[in-house]
């Protein structure tokens, strides 16, 4: 938030106009700047969508892992498509860190217990901090749009043709969503 206000109030802050400075666009779109993953889709991102995905991915990969990004546009212009690719990039980045654990259970640490009844006291675990980075918040003045994204993206139909090959906490996701899903990505 501080960065946003600083940019708005600081007259010395440099704003880029990509139509006047296409070299910025070209630099961002070299293959080395693409994230390691994208959403399984028969369609590729448009030029400006890919620029946005690469920019957000780079910012979220930085040391501070912070930034405010605005995506505006009328319905049907690819905002959800853009968000899908950003989510895919985050998931792949986490997966690359998760393979470093010798077994899945080592990615979690017991932090407590909750006594639900006399005979049932489940444990509470927290994930290792190395797999918790890159979180995003999706906000909109249209709460229905955000709710739709949160409910739709985990569904199997959203991973067209790949839903049997991909899984991200699938069992937990199906318990939360109440129907077949490929992964848990929104809360």
Please state what every model-predicted region is:
Residues 1-187:
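Helicase P-loop NTPase motor core of nucleic-acid translocases
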């Amino acid at each position: 938030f501080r960065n946003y206000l600083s940019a708005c109030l600081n007259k010395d802050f440099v704003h880029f106009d990509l139509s006047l400075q296409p070299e910025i666009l070209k630099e961002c779109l070299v293959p080395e700047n693409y994230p390691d993953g994208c959403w399984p889709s028969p369609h590729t991102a448009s030029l400006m969508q890919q620029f946005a995905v690469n920019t957000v991915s780079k910012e979220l990969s930085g040391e501070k892992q912070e930034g405010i990004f605005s995506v505006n546009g009328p319905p049907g212009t690819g905002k959800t498509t853009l968000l899908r690719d950003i989510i895919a990039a985050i998931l792949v980045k986490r997966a690359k860190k998760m393979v470093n654990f010798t077994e899945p259970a080592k990615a979690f640490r017991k932090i407590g217990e909750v006594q639900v009844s006399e005979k049932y006291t489940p444990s509470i675990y927290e994930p290792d901090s190395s797999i918790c980075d890159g979180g995003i918040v999706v906000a909109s003045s249209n709460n229905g749009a955000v709710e739709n994204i949160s409910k739709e993206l985990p569904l199997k139909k959203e991973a067209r043709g790949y839903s049997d090959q991909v899984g991200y906490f699938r069992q937990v996701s199906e318990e939360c969503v109440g129907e077949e899903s490929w992964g848990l990505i929104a809360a």
